[in-house]
């Protein structure tokens, strides 16, 4: 083949004569100086045909797509190792992959199930919760839960103070969404002096840390005399909050003001001597204390005394 290629040199090839240093074009039709009998073409047409074949082969690209076997994969493996996969095998592989996906098989990757699970639980809690507005201030959470218990099992009831109205609103959560749907029929029911409105809730009830809940009958009685106040001016002191509620509602027996450097406002727990004072304090929602309108709602937790640590012996 090398001999044939040498014979079929293109007519435009330049051959150096080695003497003058000038390039002299030499036609391929001229015969080489030394030519064996085996390389001599039998006829000129046969020679021309051979030359065309050699020229054609020289233009071919062995790596072209049409000359690359379909069963050979483009991998980092060496060229002498070829993996042959039948079309049916490829189809079976796709079926196996889909089956693993359906079975939540995710080798080498972390499946974030806890986040998805918590989102699903939150959405389920929203479906089981209704929003109740225009609640009279004389209505307690126990009384409201008793009213809605006719629709299904009530698992949580939270009354909150509305800063824009003397009336309050609440969230009632049921054990299933059927109870929440049934509760919608209670819209317009008179509770106290006002008919309440009942709508599907757009939020779930924020859970309370169980360690903060009342642990005894005495602490439950304390909760009935305690309010939870938010949006308190950051510059307000405990004396400011105490003076505000004592002059407007009644005697304050205990107060806890909490805040940090991150949030722009603070929160407060205020315990009164009488439960009636705590009910009256709910009317203070929307009143400006310092430079912020406060929001007041019944407290779910009592104000516990701070634990004082005795100095360690030397």
UniProtKB/Swiss-Prot annotation:
Domain RRM: 128-203, 225-301
Residue interval(s) of motif PAM2-like: 59-69
Region Disordered: start-end pairs: 1-47
An example Gene Ontology molecular-function term: RNA binding
Residue ranges of the motif Bipartite nuclear localization signal: 99-112
Keyword check for Repeat: yes
Subcellular location(s) per record: Nucleus
Basic and acidic residues bias spans: 23-47
GO cellular component, one term: nucleus
Subunit structure: Interacts with MPC.
Name this polypeptide is given: Polyadenylate-binding protein-interacting protein 8
Native source species: Arabidopsis thaliana
